[in-house]
């Protein structure tokens, strides 16, 4: 179970467009309202055989199939969609509740705004998505479903926070969230390419997205590259039980990651 292979699957599951791979994260005038507000909320995201042939054991198999479907609906099997949905929220909460955002703002000279909160959240959510795809990237598999649920949980939180900050202008808030969504999709592709390549490629991806091309301190970029590599290694080492069944993600502290 390697994150690098999972990343390739993740990248394959995304719609790669020419625009996305060349996206330079240009800020539009529309995002200057909500995204630059002080972040009061984050200072403390086959073929079916229809013949009627009767074969030995058919009735028993049918009964077993019905029982399995019933158990799946009520959540008594270990890998139900309902269980994975709960897991996705627990994993997202491990980011929103346990990451020290203030440390990121301070150490990387980020303004205390909603946009900075999203950039930090986005980076850690991407790490979770990469690890999720190691559990199966095909349609219907646990990893792909879990990935989608984590993204849903993140956008649910983003919408809640954005509405509180932009309650006076809901229409503009929606437009700004759409802009973030476009940037998020492009960031996933850039980060995937970076993690599968050497540190220079990853550093470029982080400089363009996380630092928004506004960082001349190479030590800061090198430190963030090291931090991302260490977090990816930590997640890759987690067995399925500690990631999906009973999520126990112990994020490494930024303060302990020095160049």
Swiss-Prot record:
Origin: domain of life: Eukaryota
Keyword line: Membrane, Mitochondrion, Mitochondrion inner membrane
Compartments in which it is found: Mitochondrion inner membrane
Gene Ontology biological process: mitochondrial respiratory chain complex III assembly
Main location: mitochondrion
Glycoprotein keyword on record: no
This protein's GO CC annotations: mitochondrial inner membrane; mitochondrion
Subunit record text: Interacts with sloth1; the interaction is probably involved in the assembly and stability of the mitochondrial ubiquinol-cytochrome c reductase complex.
Functional note: Required for the assembly of the ubiquinol-cytochrome c reductase complex (mitochondrial respiratory chain complex III or cytochrome b-c1 complex). May be involved in cytochrome b translation and/or stability.
Family under the similarity heading: Belongs to the CBP3 family.
Protein name: Ubiquinol-cytochrome c reductase complex assembly factor 1
Gene coding for it: Uqcc1
């Amino acid at each position: 179970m390697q994150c690098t292979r999972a990343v390739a699957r993740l990248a394959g599951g995304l719609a790669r467009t020419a625009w996305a791979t060349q996206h330079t994260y240009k800020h539009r005038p529309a995002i200057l309202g909500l995204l630059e507000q002080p972040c009061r909320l984050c200072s403390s995201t086959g073929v079916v055989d229809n013949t009627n042939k009767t074969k030995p054991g058919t009735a028993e198999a049918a009964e077993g199939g019905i029982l399995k479907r019933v158990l799946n609906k009520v959540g008594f099997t270990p890998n139900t969609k309902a269980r994975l949905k709960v897991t996705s929220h627990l994993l997202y909460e491990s980011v929103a509740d346990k990451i020290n955002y203030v440390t990121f703002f301070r150490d990387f000279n980020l303004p205390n705004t909603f946009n900075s909160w999203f950039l930090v959240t986005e980076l850690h959510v991407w790490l979770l998505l990469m690890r999720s795809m190691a559990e199966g990237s095909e349609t219907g598999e646990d990893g792909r479903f879990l990935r989608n649920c984590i993204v849903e949980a993140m956008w649910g939180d983003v919408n809640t926070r954005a509405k509180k900050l932009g309650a006076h202008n809901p229409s503009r808030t929606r437009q700004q969230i759409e802009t973030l969504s476009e940037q998020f999709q492009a960031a996933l592709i850039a980060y995937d390419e970076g993690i599968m390549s050497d540190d220079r490629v990853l550093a470029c991806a982080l400089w363009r997205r996380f630092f928004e091309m506004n960082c001349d301190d190479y030590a800061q970029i090198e430190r963030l590259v090291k931090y991302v590599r260490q977090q990816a290694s930590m997640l890759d080492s987690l067995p399925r039980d500690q990631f999906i069944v009973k999520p126990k993600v112990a994020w490494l502290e930024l303060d302990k990651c020095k160049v």
